[in-house]
Swiss-Prot record:
This is Arginine--tRNA ligase. Belongs to the class-I aminoacyl-tRNA synthetase family. InterPro entries: aa-tRNA-synth_I_CS, Arg-tRNA-ligase, Arg-tRNA-synth_N, Arg-tRNA-synth_N_sf, ArgRS_core, DALR_anticod-bd, Rossmann-like_a/b/a_fold, tRNAsynth_Ia_anticodon-bd. It comes from Rhodospirillum rubrum (strain ATCC 11170 / ATH 1.1.1 / DSM 467 / LMG 4362 / NCIMB 8255 / S1). GO terms for cellular component: cytoplasm. It catalyses: tRNA(Arg) + L-arginine + ATP = L-arginyl-tRNA(Arg) + AMP + diphosphate. Its EC number is 6.1.1.19. One of its GO terms (biological process) is arginyl-tRNA aminoacylation. Monomer. A motif ('HIGH' region) lies at residues 131-141. HAMAP family: Arg_tRNA_synth. The keyword Cytoplasm applies. It is found in: Cytoplasm.
C-alpha cells in the first residue's frame, strides 16, 4: 500500500472530473503531477503541485486551478481538508484512519512492505566492480561493490528483474603486467632470483605488482612445475602465467566480494568475447549501418587522449549519438581498442535482452561516459538506455589520521583488511551514507563508536530497542498473542493519538514512496537517510517515556494502549529491517 500513490490517483480522478464538467480542457499532460510530504509538517499531511503543472496548458492561473481542485478533493477518499498555498500548491490533510490502515499493512506484510511493481518486471543489467583481475580489491572497489549491490537490491524491491554482472577485463596489457610480476615471484620461489633483485625490478618499474598476494600463487607453481619455466622463452611462459594469474586473482576477488556479502550472477570475460567473434559481429552490424569509417581525427585541444593518433584510423561515428568526437576502434598494430571490446560487450548485453543497463564505474572514468552512452544508443538502435553511476574515492582514516599502507597489497589498504577489522555490515552501511559521486571518509574510530553520530549504530540501536520492547511485552502480557498478524487484527490503533505517534506512523507510511523514488533515481543512499529519520523519530518516542512513565510503550495497567503502541514499535522494526535488507545488512536484535 502506497498512500501517496493512492492520493495521487484521487487527485488525477478529480482532474478528470473537472474535465468532464468542461471546467478544465481535455488532453492535459498529467505526468508531472506529484503528491509528496509537505516541506513543513504544520502545512498538512501531503502537498500536490497539480494546479501548478496544469495551469499553463489549461490557460488558467495556478490558484484558479487549485481552488477548483480544493473544492473537489475535500471529503473524497479520506481527504478531510485541502487548502491552496502560495502560488498554487495544494496542502492536504487526511483522516487519521488512512494512516492507521497503512500501519496495519506494515504489520501484515512485514519486510515486504515497500515492495513495488513500478519496474513491471523489466530486465535491467547492473554491471559493477569489474576490477582488473590483477590483485585483491581495494576500498574504492568496495564502495563500488556495495553501491552496485544495494542498487540492484533496490531495483528488485521496486519491481525490476535484475542481473548483477562483472565484466572481467582479461584481454589488456594489465594482465600481461600481472603475468610478468607473477613470473618474477616464481623465479624467487625457485631460487632463480633473489629478493634484492626482485625489489630492484620493482623499483625500476620492470614489474608493476609487488604485493605479497602473488607469493602463494608463485609457490604453488614452483611446487607443481619446479624450474621448468626458467629456461623457456617469454612467448612460452607468458600465456601460461597470464592464465594462472587471471584465474587465481579472480578467485581472490570473488573471496573478497563474498566477505562483503556481494555475489554476482554473471561474470563475462572480455577475452572470451573477442575469441567468440563478438567484436567482429559488432563491427559487421555497425558497418552495415554506415556507423564505421576510415578517417583522421583532428588533434584535440588541451590534453591529448590516449587513443588519438595522427593517422587514418577505423572510427566509430560516436558524434552521431551525443559524443564529442568519433572514436578509434583499431590500434596502429591492427588490434582492437579497449573501446571496441566495450562496444561489443554492450552489444552482447543488448542481444541478451537488456534494454536497461547500469554501469557502476570509478570516478576516474568520467571521461568515458559519453562514448559508452553513444555506443549503447548505436548498437541498440536507440532501444536500450544506459545510466553510468560514478563512484567517488574513499579516504581511510583512524581518529582523523590517514591509514598507512598495507603490506598485503604493497600499495593500498585492501577491502578484506577493512572488512576483517569492522565487519561487513558496518562497511556496507557506511559506504551508502553518502551519494555515490561524493567523496567519503571512512574513519575506523567513528564507524565503531556507540553514539548517535555513528549512523550504522544509530539505526541498528533503534531496531534493537524495538526488539527489546517486543521481548518485554511478552513478559508483561503472558499468554497474549503478540505477533504482528495478531496486532494487525486486534490492536486498537485509534489509541495512537499523540502527535509524535502519528508523525511516526506517517513517516513509516512514506517507505513505499521512498523505495520508488530512490529506485527511479538510482540512489540507494536515500534509504540510509530515511532510516536515519526513522531511527531518530523512534529514539524520540523512547526517550519521552524516560521523562513521563505514562508515555512508555508498555503500560501494565493499560493493555489496550500498550498493544497499540507495540503495533507501532513492531512496524518500526519491520521498516528498518526492510531498509537494511536492501543494504544487505543484518538487523541487530540485541546490542552487545
Amino acid at each position: 500500500m502506497n498512500v501517496f500513490h493512492d492520493i495521487k490517483e484521487t487527485v488525477l480522478a478529480q482532474v478528470a472530473a473537472l474535465q468532464a464538467e468542461g471546467r478544465l480542457p481535455e488532453g492535459l499532460e498529467t505526468g508531472r503531477v506529484a503528491v509528496e510530504p509537505p516541506r513543513e509538517a504544520a502545512h498538512g499531511d501531503m502537498a500536490t503541485n497539480a494546479a501548478m503543472v496544469l495551469a499553463k496548458p489549461a490557460g488558467l492561473a495556478p490558484r484558479a486551478v487549485a481552488e477548483m481542485l480544493v473544492e473537489k478533493l475535500v471529503g473524497v477518499d479520506g481527504i478531510v481538508a485541502a487548502e491552496t498555498a502560495g502560488p498554487g500548491f495544494i496542502n492536504l490533510r487526511l483522516d487519521p484512519k488512512i494512516w492507521r490502515k497503512t500501519l496495519k499493512t506494515v504489520l501484515t506484510l512485514g519486510t515486504a512492505f515497500g515492495a513495488s511493481t513500478m519496474g513491471r518486471g523489466a530486465a535491467v543489467n547492473v554491471e559493477f566492480v569489474s576490477a582488473n583481475p590483477t590483485g585483491p580489491m581495494h576500498v574504492g572497489h568496495g564502495r563500488g561493490a556495495v553501491f552496485g549491490d544495494a542498487l540492484a537490491a533496490l531495483l528488485v524491491k521496486a519491481g525490476w528483474a535484475v542481473t548483477r554482472e562483472y565484466y572481467v577485463n582479461d584481454a589488456g596489457a594489465q594482465v600481461d603486467s600481472l603475468a610478468r610480476a607473477l613470473y618474477a615471484r616464481y623465479r624467487v620461489a625457485v631460487g632463480d632470483l633473489d629478493e634484492a633483485a626482485f625489489a630492484a625490478m620493482l623499483a625500476a618499474r620492470e614489474i608493476e605488482y609487488g604485493g605479497d598476494y602473488l607469493v602463494p600463487v608463485a609457490a604453488d607453481i614452483a611446487q607443481a612445475d619446479g624450474t621448468r619455466w626458467t629456461t623457456v622463452a617469454e612467448s612460452d611462459w607468458l600465456p601460461a602465467f597470464r592464465a594462472i594469474g587471471i584465474e587465481r586473482m579472480l578467485a581472490l576477488i570473488k573471496e573478497d566480494l563474498a566477505a562483503l556479502g556481494v555475489v554476482h550472477d554473471v561474470f563475462t570475460s572480455e577475452q572470451a568475447l573477442v575469441r567468440a567473434g563478438r567484436v567482429d559481429e559488432m563491427m559487421t552490424d555497425l558497418e552495415s549501418r554506415d556507423l564505421v569509417y576510415v578517417g583522421t581525427l583532428e588533434p584535440p585541444k588541451g590534453k591529448t587522449p590516449d587513443d588519438w593518433e595522427p593517422r587514418p584510423q577505423t572510427l566509430f561515428r560516436a558524434t552521431g549519438f551525443g559524443d564529442e568526437v568519433d572514436r578509434p576502434l583499431k590500434k596502429s598494430d591492427g588490434s582492437w581498442t579497449y573501446f571496441a571490446s566495450d562496444i561489443a560487450y554492450h552489444h552482447d548485453k543488448f542481444k541478451r535482452g537488456f534494454l536497461g543497463m547500469i554501469n557502476v564505474l570509478g570516478a576516474d572514468h568520467g571521461g568515458y561516459v559519453k562514448r559508452l552512452k553513444a555506443a549503447v544508443k548505436a548498437v541498440s538502435n536507440g532501444e536500450a538506455e544506459l545510466d553510468v553511476k560514478l563512484v567517488q574515492l574513499v579516504k581511510l582514516l583512524d581518529n582523523g589520521e590517514p591509514v598507512k599502507m598495507s603490506k598485503r597489497a604493497g600499495t593500498f589498504i585492501t577491502l578484506r583488511e577493512v572488512v576483517d577489522e569492522v565487519g561487513k555490515d558496518v562497511v556496507r552501511f557506511i559506504m551508502l551514507t553518502r551519494k555515490n559521486d561524493a567523496a567519503l571518509d571512512f574513519d575506523y574510530a567513528r564507524v565503531t563508536e556507540k553514539t548517535r553520530d555513528n549512523p550504522v549504530f544509530y539505526v541498528q540501536y533503534a531496531h534493537a530497542r524495538a526488539c527489546s520492547v517486543a521481548r518485554h511485552a511478552a513478559q508483561t502480557f503472558p499468554g497474549r498473542d503478540l505477533s504482528a498478524a495478531a496486532l494487525a487484527a486486534t490492536a486498537d490503533l485509534d489509541l495512537l493519538d499523540a502527535d509524535e505517534e502519528m508523525a511516526m506512523v506517517r513517516l513509516l507510511a512514506g517507505w513505499p514512496r521512498l523505495v520508488e523514488s530512490a529506485a527511479e533515481a538510482h540512489e540507494p543512499h536515500r534509504v540510509a537517510f530515511y532510516l536515519g529519520e526513522v531511527a531518530a523519530a523512534f529514539h524520540g518516542l523512547w526517550n519521552r517515556g524516560n521523562d513521563n512513565a505514562e508515555l512508555r510503550f508498555l503500560l501494565p495497567t493499560d493493555e489496550a494502549r500498550s498493544l497499540a503502541r507495540l503495533a507501532l514499535v513492531q512496524a518500526v522494526a519491520s521498516v528498518i529491517a526492510s531498509g537494511l535488507e536492501i543494504f544487505g545488512v543484518e538487523p541487530v536484535k540485541e546490542m552487545r
